[in-house]
């Protein structure tokens, strides 16, 4: 708790001179360790380190100021390049590409500059569940190896106002 408060106050940035960048929760729900995702591609960090969120609602927001690199046409995932350089992948549910976009409504396009908190995707979580698919949403930093500091904050309910990843080069 004390460490988190010191991070928020910028203590470590002042002490060590490293800028700390924050990635906020893109979807409201319970933040869990990436290892809890029932898909080894995500759980074993093959695409990068991060967290996952068990969503409480079906709105995906920009987790920081960024540029949309790829908005998948099916709406099930989006990759962003954060202004700080982090390459972020948000994958809504597992195996949801097979739903062919039906439960998704996209609100951004490739190349769009987005601000933290801007709506990117809406998803009908009930439709995903009715299809028998998990709604757990991995949030990855694909270039996580580029960072010397990589902290995740899990085990609690989060909204777009909560930092879930902090990183520094």
List the predicted regions and their residue ranges.
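Contiguous, well-folded functional domains in the mature portion of proteins
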Residues: 5-169
């Amino acid at each position: 708790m004390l460490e988190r408060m010191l991070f928020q106050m910028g203590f470590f940035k002042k002490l060590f001179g490293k800028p700390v960048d924050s990635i906020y929760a893109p979807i409201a729900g319970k933040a869990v360790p990436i290892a809890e995702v029932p898909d080894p591609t995500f759980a074993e960090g093959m695409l990068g380190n991060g967290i996952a969120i068990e969503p409480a609602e079906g709105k995906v927001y920009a987790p920081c100021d960024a540029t949309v690199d790829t908005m998948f046409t099916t709406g099930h995932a989006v990759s962003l390049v954060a202004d700080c350089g982090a390459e972020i992948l948000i994958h809504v549910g597992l195996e949801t590409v097979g739903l062919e976009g039906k439960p998704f409504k996209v609100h951004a396009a490739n190349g769009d500059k987005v601000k933290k908190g801007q709506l990117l995707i809406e998803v009908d979580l009930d439709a995903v569940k009715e299809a028998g698919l998990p709604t757990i949403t991995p949030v990855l930093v694909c270039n996580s190896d580029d960072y010397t500091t990589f902290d995740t904050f899990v085990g609690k309910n989060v909204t777009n106002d909560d930092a879930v990843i902090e990183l520094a080069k």
